[in-house]
Amino acid sequence: MFRKKWLKARYGEEEGNKLWELINRQYDKYLEDLPDYPPVEELQELVTKLFMSGFVKLGKFFNLNRSFDMWLINKVFQKIGEKDRKLYAQYPACFCNISEPYDKKNHAARYHFTQCPNAEFAKKHTLMHVLPLFCNSDYWGISQIHGTLIRHGTCGNSDKCDYCVVGSENPMAKEYEIIKDEDGFLVSRKLEY
């Protein structure tokens, strides 16, 4: 958005908007000429390292199999949810995080997004084939803090992106398997016995 703002300041509102539109069209043409993408596995590794590497360090002292750490991550989810909802009032296109009460029975922290700017961008710019690379990284990130993510969908393949986080040794973690859906998203499916 900085570039668009700069164009408007330099060339005026109308001309700045025209230039921004031309830039976007040119960029779209450029994307059509890009060579084939590398294998998904290679891209997944890159995206995961880029966005989730902090979880490796965090996992050295944070362990979701400890009740205090589960309580703490729930508090973090609650605070982030409060912050997101305040931002949502000011910036309606941002993440909309809905915190859920801590599940004391199952020792599970839950929240969900009803809106994700990454998913909206991917839909608008026909980049849905890339979106799973970002969404799927969450599983790896949570595993680095000795947890398991149980997710039924994301804003890319469902009406919400749900997070149910439990310790990796929690019996609930063993009730699910992670599968890849037809669009490339990792999702949790309850095991049938």
Annotated model-derived regions:
Residues 9-13, 17-124:
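Amphipathic interaction/junction segments at domain boundaries or subunit interfaces
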Residues 7, 136, 169-171:
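An N-terminal assembly and electron-transfer interface module characteristic of large anaerobic redox
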Residues 97-157:
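Short, hydrophobic/π-rich interface segment
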Residues 149, 171-184:
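Domain-exit/linker segments immediately C-terminal to small folded modules
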Residues 152, 158-168:
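C-terminal edge-of-domain segments
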Residues 140, 178-193:
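Short, cationic low-complexity segments
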Residues 118-121, 168-175:
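Short, charged/polar, Gly/Pro-enriched secondary-structure boundary elements
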